[in-house]
Amino acid sequence: MRSFLSLMVFIFVFASCLEQGPSVGTPMMPSSDKKEMYPQTNVGEILKGYRTPEVVDVLWDTTFNVTPGLDYYQFQLLTYEMEKLDTYLLRVDPSKGLELKVGVSKQTTPYVWHKQVLTRMAADMSTASNPVYAMVNGDFCDNRKPIRPRGPVHSEGEILAQGYSQDPDYKHQGLSYLGVTFDGQMTIGPTENYESAKTTLKECTGGGVILIKDYEIQGGLVVWNKDRDPRTAVGYTSDNIVWVLAVDGRHKGTEGMTYVEMASVFHGLGCKDAVNLDGGGSTEMVVRDPYSGKIMICNWPSDPTDGDGGVERERPTTWAVVKK
């Protein structure tokens, strides 16, 4: 009964936010303040468990099936440092006929890059027979003219960019790659492995700090960055289940996650590897409502930083969930 009630609240809020088309979602709140009701989801139970030491409580959670093989989760987590975090997760099972695909603007070529907001890019990528079911932002971006992603970009087997545009002022960028091989396997590796791997990668973007490698939380994450910020990251298990994370930050009530906390979440989910992507005002997750068919912005983007956020930032690359 509790799960049914939670689902009905989720559907009502989700649908009401979609009446005006693509829009920014406000964090959904529980219908009751009875703490003992939560967590209600299996993933919430995992995140509250011993495998995720940086999360001490799940204050609220819910889940919704977007399409077979794709589940959406939303949580309010309480961290070891007593920070409340609005957190969003996608669970993608490629064995159910889904795949992760890199999205770019229609105007982008290997020589000229363009940026686009996610709701527009998702609409442009969608067809009647194969809509984009979900999308998150991709790699970091070098905003100097002409703009370009920090790392390599492969889309549907075409190499749009290779190599890395690194900057000593942004040492946490241009450190890795996230890819999908031609046989559908997820892969994450450091920059030095890209050249030998690139011919095997159907989809690929660059990435930042590697959070998990071979099931181990990587050392030195505190050295890289102790700050709280909005975050986007991707991890996967040994059986190729993909977890996509977005966390709100830079506004009252949810300041953002640290690298250590992100790594702890992916470790709790049993991920073999996980990597950080672009964050800050770039962090965004959109999901297609299965009832209305409209795209919903699930999180609360932090731009503009001098206000209360809620504005999409244009990005050169994204990761989309579509049918194979």
Sequence positions of predicted segments:
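C-terminal motif of bacterial Sec signal peptides marking the signal peptidase cleavage site
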Residues: 14-16
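Solvent-exposed loop/turn segments at secondary-structure junctions
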Residues: 96-97, 139-144, 194-195, 249-252, ...
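Active-site-adjacent helix-turn-beta-strand microarchitecture at beta-sheet edges
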Residues: 137, 141-223
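Conserved, well-ordered active-site substructure
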Residues: 146-165, 220-236, 241-271, 282-324
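Conserved beta-alpha junction segments in alpha/beta enzyme cores
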Residues: 76-79, 85, 89, 206-239
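Structural recognition of the beta-strand scaffold that forms the well-ordered cores
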Residues: 133-137, 177-179, 187-189, 233-235, ...
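Positively charged n-region of N-terminal signal peptides that target proteins for export
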Residues: 1-4
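Zymogen propeptides
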Residues: 18-169
